[in-house]
Regions:
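Hydrophobic transmembrane alpha-helices and their immediate loop junctions
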Residues: 1-222
Length: 222
């Protein structure tokens, strides 16, 4: 893919990083007031998105689908495959594998946090506070790790096609109706949700909701 560069081949799958991610990382790290904390957040998130995409890729490969590469973008990642799964069951398994990776990591990290005595204030005052203090202690890092995994897992399960949740919805619908009709319904649900998120964001819900609304179009994850 143009403007992306190979950085490794985990499990024999080429991973590429888009130049926009590199520019974004450089800008956020060196322009912000907390370069070490920002770098920790960015590269932890980078690793979690990669694991998310590897979840999709390894399940796809298990079902005989060739994975061409994984490209990491500023707001997500994309596992490029040689074909779309023909079976709704296989498509559902491939789609849900990515979010499940993040949710399992969040659950395991929450257990570890409990062993370290951090359950009493597991999430702290807010996600923003957790991320701002990511390097202050091992428990703070774990809280940030949990928060990022939950955001990735839950965000991707929103049934807004072509995101993972939308693909799972299409796979479920396709078990009882033609594939084309299932796609139209899943896409329609995604458009309604995108409109709702955009309206909420414009009315004061925050920029994050606007990003949710447009990201399935601009930066599809998985």
């Amino acid at each position: 893919m143009n403007e992306s560069y190979p950085i490794g081949r985990p499990f024999g799958i080429e991973v590429r990083v888009h130049i926009l991610f590199l520019w974004m990382a450089f800008f956020l790290i060196f322009v912000g007031g907390n370069p070490l904390g920002t770098a920790a957040i960015l590269f932890t998130l980078f690793g979690l998105v990669l694991l998310h995409e590897l979840g999709h890729s390894l399940v796809a490969r298990h079902h005989g689908i060739q994975v061409l590469d994984i490209v990491l973008w500023p707001l997500g990642g994309m596992a490029r495959m040689s074909e779309i799964p023909e079976s709704p069951r296989v498509e559902g398994q491939v789609a849900i594998a990515g979010p499940l990776v993040n949710l399992v990591l969040a659950a395991a990290s929450l257990l570890l946090l409990g062993l370290l005595g951090g359950w009493g204030e597991a999430m702290g005052p807010s996600v923003a506070y957790i991320l701002a203090h990511i390097l202050e202690s091992p428990t703070n890092f774990l809280r940030a790790f949990i928060a990022m995994n939950l955001m990735l897992g839950v965000f991707n399960l929103v049934p807004a096609f072509p995101m993972d949740g939308g693909r799972v919805l299409r796979a479920l619908l396709a078990t009882s109706m033609p594939y084309v009709r299932a796609t139209r319904i899943a896409a329609g649900v995604g458009q309604v949700l995108a409109f709702g998120f955009a309206a909420w964001g414009l009315m004061g819900g925050g920029i994050f909701l606007l990003i949710i609304a447009i990201s399935p179009v601009l930066f599809p994850l998985g």
